A protein has these predicted regions:
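Short, flexible helix-loop junctions that flank or precede catalytic/ligand sites
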Residues: 1-238
Length: 238
């Protein structure tokens, strides 16, 4: 997801669940955004040539079970992340992409061969943050055939109609059918169609569920999520 979509918070929460006494969990970050005693954290320092790639290379000598890379920004970091995964380590990282299937094309743009992506990628999660309706002033929509509520505004929410935020998630788990579509210059739309056929819930679909539950508005969901496809009635083309 983009900057400010909650990727770091989700990543740390996931790692905290995995960090037990038996697990050696190491991170390379720029900067270290949350100090966590259960992790072995390393900060990138360009003035001494400690980059993401060189940091991963150093961590591989420390017998880690899980490696977290703050962000994959360049080819060298991507290649080292793949190398770590190929040697039996569980690797977590973040990428700036619009949705989950686009992560595959992004890795290819960074120079990672398609067969290496097939061999190492387990899954991708895209996310966005959506504003929640204020529980003190929201009201049901007037239309009889419409589910959900609308924003009003009160002193509790400073007349914005919203209070708090929640995550929208799109999780794409790699299976043989999706792996078969990971080819040189992979078609992102073909990957998306197959993932949806396999049961993936898109960011927009996740948002619509929150609208139906009266937690947010359709306007808010359309603001933060990309369109799904031409076959979706709520598709908004670029």
């Amino acid at each position: 997801g983009p900057t400010g979509s909650g990727k770091t918070s989700t990543l740390y929460t996931t790692l905290r669940q995995l960090a037990t006494r038996e697990v050696n969990l190491c991170t390379v970050e720029d900067p270290i955004e949350m100090v966590e005693p259960a992790f072995n954290q390393m900060q990138v320092q360009h003035n001494i040539d400690l980059t993401f790639a060189s940091g991963i290379r150093a961590l591989l000598r420390q017998d880690p079970d899980i490696i977290m890379i703050g962000e994959i920004r360049d080819q060298e970091t991507a290649e080292m992340a793949i190398q770590a995964a190929l040697t039996g380590h569980l690797v977590f990282s973040t990428l700036h992409t619009n949705d989950a299937p686009s992560a595959i094309s992004r890795l290819q743009e960074l120079g990672v061969a398609h067969y290496l992506i097939k061999a190492t990628l387990i899954g991708v999660m895209a996310q966005r943050l959506v504003r929640l309706l204020c529980s003190h002033c929201k009201r049901p929509l007037d239309q009889e055939d419409a589910d959900g509520c609308e924003a009003v505004g009160c002193a509790q929410c400073r007349d914005s109609g919203y209070q708090g935020r929640a995550g929208l998630y799109e999780i794409m788990l790699m299976d043989p059918a999706l792996q078969a579509l990971v080819t040189p210059g992979a078609d992102v739309q073909a990957l998306r169609r197959e993932a949806l056929a396999q049961g993936m819930s898109s960011l927009r679909m996740a948002g619509i569920e929150k609208v139906k539950a009266g937690l947010t508005t359709m306007t808010e969901v359309l603001r933060v999520t990309p369109g799904d496809s031409e076959t979706n009635p709520l598709f908004i083309g670029a």
